[in-house]
Design a protein with these regions (language model features):
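Short, intrinsically disordered low-complexity segments
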Residues: 26-99
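Acidic, proline/glycine-rich low-complexity IDRs
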Residues: 1-22, 30-49, 95, 102-135
């Protein structure tokens, strides 16, 4: 009895990661220009800013790490109370591919060294909250 040889190549499943978003909450008035100047762990060519949008992009291996100013979206009284209680002056949405997590952590550590702050989840109550060291 002869078996047919399976000529079909098996597809290797490639982990493409997931895009996730958190809020980087900063206790200082900073702009994307300040953010980009504080990041040294990536090549200069990998960093780009759009000052008119208050947006920074850092090209990483799987995708880009993007910081976008989100202060205008925190308009509810509860939001403002939260920000005031935590001493937050600026909020940036930070979105990235989970496959880039190690490099994202390095970038966040550099930003934290320069400006302080913490990460909050993109949820209704902003929980859980992470210190940069635990992120």
């Amino acid at each position: 009895m002869k078996f047919k040889k399976d000529d079909k190549k098996k597809k290797v499943s490639e982990d493409k990661g997931t895009i996730v978003e958190y809020f980087y909450m900063i206790p200082a008035e900073v702009t994307v220009r300040d953010l980009v100047e504080a990041v040294h762990c990536v090549d200069e060519e990998a960093k780009e800013i759009w000052t008119e949008l208050d947006l920074m992009e850092i090209v990483l291996s799987a995708d880009s790490l993007i910081f976008e100013n989100m202060m205008d979206t925190f308009t509810e009284p509860g939001d403002r109370e939260f920000l005031a209680a935590k001493g937050v002056k600026v909020v940036y949405a930070a979105s990235y591919n989970t496959n880039d997590k190690e490099m994202v952590k390095k970038v966040l550590e550099e930003l934290h060294a320069a400006f302080g702050g913490f990460m909050a989840s993109d949820t209704e109550d902003l929980e859980p909250i992470f210190e940069i060291a635990d992120f």
